[in-house]
């Protein structure tokens, strides 16, 4: 790890719950302008990794640096989208208020939001096609709509690094396509994104790089080098039944798409 200004550096990170280790000795460096997927079986520590980076779960050992800094002062450059299950959807707050929370890093918690902040929040809602729902209570929305709102909140933070914990879970195909389109747009602007993902059928198409995790780091690198039968087997072990076929199908699909683009 030779770049102090990498968006995300992790060294020898170990995390335990009730003295039971769930992550062991994780070493990672994520480069600027990459769209990175985190995959692995249930219980692999994927969400724990994201929460530890955000300071929501304490590390037992090792360290995390965001743009070369440790601690809370670095979080102003991070946009975070949590799992839907971790949110209290009954809290009486409007869609617009949720997105405005993403502006607190700019205005501070005790200062009033400005017209500019409201304008930014509305622009972000418009990007995810949720502006007509700005005054609606967040708990009255569908799962896919709620996920769009939290994505808008992350966009409102105008961050350089985005951490997203399974943003595609429970959404329809239209919402999923909208989300991946926004992620690619952010990447094109030089932003860095780390996304926990569970669907191997499209992982190779969605991401530039993959982190294969099962309590330990199995692999990290470009999808062509990491999304292989051998590394998937190491990651998922005996639970790997149809995943090798998925890997082959994804490779064939990418090949056919390339051939089609070259022939047109």
Locate each region found by the language model:
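The feature captures the beta-strand-to-loop junction immediately N-terminal to the Walker
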Residues: 39-41
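Conserved ABC ATPase signature
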Residues: 137-141, 145
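Catalytic Walker B motif of ABC-type/P-loop ATPase nucleotide-binding domains
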Residues: 162-165
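Helix-to-loop junction immediately C-terminal to a conserved catalytic motif
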Residues: 54
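H-loop/switch region of ABC-family ATPase nucleotide-binding domains
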Residues: 197-198
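Conserved ABC transporter NBD signature motif
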Residues: 62-76
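Conserved ABC ATPase "signature" region
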Residues: 100, 115-133
């Amino acid at each position: 790890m030779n770049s102090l200004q990498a968006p995300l550096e992790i060294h020898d990170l170990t995390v335990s719950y009730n003295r039971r280790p769930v992550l062991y000795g994780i070493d990672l460096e994520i480069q600027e302008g990459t769209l990175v997927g985190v995959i692995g079986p249930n219980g692999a520590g994927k969400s724990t990794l994201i929460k530890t980076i955000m300071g929501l779960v304490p590390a037992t050992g090792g360290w995390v640096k965001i743009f070369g800094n440790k601690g809370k002062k670095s979080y102003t450059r991070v946009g975070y989208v949590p799992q839907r299950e971790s949110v209290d959807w009954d809290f009486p707050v409007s869609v617009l208020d949720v997105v405005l929370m993403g502006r607190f890093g700019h205005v501070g918690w005790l200062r009033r939001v400005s017209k500019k902040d409201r304008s930014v929040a509305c622009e972000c809602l418009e990007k995810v096609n949720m502006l007509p729902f700005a005054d609606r209570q967040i708990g009255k929305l569908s799962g896919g709509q709620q996920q769009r709102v939290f994505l808008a909140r992350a966009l409102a933070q105008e961050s350089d690094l985005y951490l997203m914990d399974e943003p595609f879970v429970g959404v329809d195909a239209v919402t999923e396509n909208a989300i991946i389109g926004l992620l690619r747009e952010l990447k094109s602007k030089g932003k860095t994104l780390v996304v926990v993902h569970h669907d191997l059928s499209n992982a190779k198409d969605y991401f530039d790089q993959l982190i294969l995790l099962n309590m330990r780091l199995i692999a990290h690198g470009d999808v062509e080098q990491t999304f292989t039968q051998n590394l998937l087997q190491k990651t998922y072990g005996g639970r790997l039944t149809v995943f090798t076929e998925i890997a082959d199908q994804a490779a064939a699909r990418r090949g056919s798409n390339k051939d089609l683009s070259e022939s047109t």
